[in-house]
């Protein structure tokens, strides 16, 4: 298939992109926007007022950014995660109402400019935005930031094959087409938000509520990773796998695309401690560092933080641990200032892609969010799986038992706490054992397959070409 390039077009096509306002959802869609922008499309990223306050730029290397109100009181804008944890159902209700009203106004404003928007790519967790797009005469593209395997489970939840709440799944075992046999603990979990679990589960299942009306269905995955499930879903809807949507510069691919992302300024919309952590990693030998991060939303208990910190110290390995500022008070007393400095570095955030690509990183202790999973896979880094909620539990199952690129911890007490002994054992399995060598070989294999998918002629490359062509000639 020939390369689609509309840079020389006198009137570029205008694409709107609206990710759910969380880092793990914004970044993958932003990276897809980068690829589309490199083909000459005009891109406008829509985000919320509170998100815009936390980003480092209002224009990302040629991608315009527009903000809309969150729908929550202004004084709580900086505490969006806390608001979600307290009453997720109320948050989503307010956000939905605000997003529908203000996205409509924004599209109407942008339609008066040249070029007017033609398509709205939106996060699949916001299916109600499709109606806004169609009412305003735009095409709608649903972008799934989770694997097809997890999406298939949510679809079966919507169909009633899996009953809500998930805790009532019969015998705790689920058998679904083209998926491994799943225990109850492998199903997408929402236990972290106990008071909101049913509301969240329904929200996730609703991703498929109007999928038959969507003009495009885009998945941040690649064919080789989940070929049977991709084919099954493709028999129902015209899906396009376009992942991994990590920056193509990390694969050292197309020069034009790499130049477009030169300096990596486009890779991160949010501020990162690049200099501090990269200098620290440069001082470590190859495969000696455990990178630890549990994402932008997951919240560990104080007891769990204690178990993780003790396991890291007892492993006698170097470690780089990302702990969000609002979570720091859960660390053991003086851990960041004294104990950890002997072997580790604790920071609030970091350039995760650069960290995972660094030669000193031996493994990744992760919550198994899909964004982090793909970034580790693309970097050829084995994982220690410590899932918290939502799709992470299923991702962990796939990482350990299907793709065989990681080991999973056991929640060994009644409170779901992972003990330090179990974490230590996982660290030693990945870093010191023969199994660890096998995990590394598998990780490198999947890294190469991911590179093939986004390279010219690969499945995801061709699907992005197909999407681009459709917009050009539709």
Swiss-Prot record:
Q: Does the keyword Transferase apply?
A: yes
Q: Superkingdom of this entry's organism?
A: Eukaryota
Q: Name one Pfam family in it.
A: UDPGT
Alphabetized PROSITE patterns for the sequence: UDPGT (PS00375)
Coiled-coil regions, chain positions: none
**GO molecular function terms here?**
quercetin 3-O-glucosyltransferase activity; quercetin 7-O-glucosyltransferase activity
User: Keywords assigned by UniProt?
Assistant: Glycosyltransferase, Transferase
Q: Give the residues the record marks as binding UDP-alpha-D-glucose.
A: 296, 349-350, 367-375, 389-392
Official protein name in the record = UDP glycosyltransferase 9
Q: Which organism is it from?
A: Catharanthus roseus (Madagascar periwinkle)
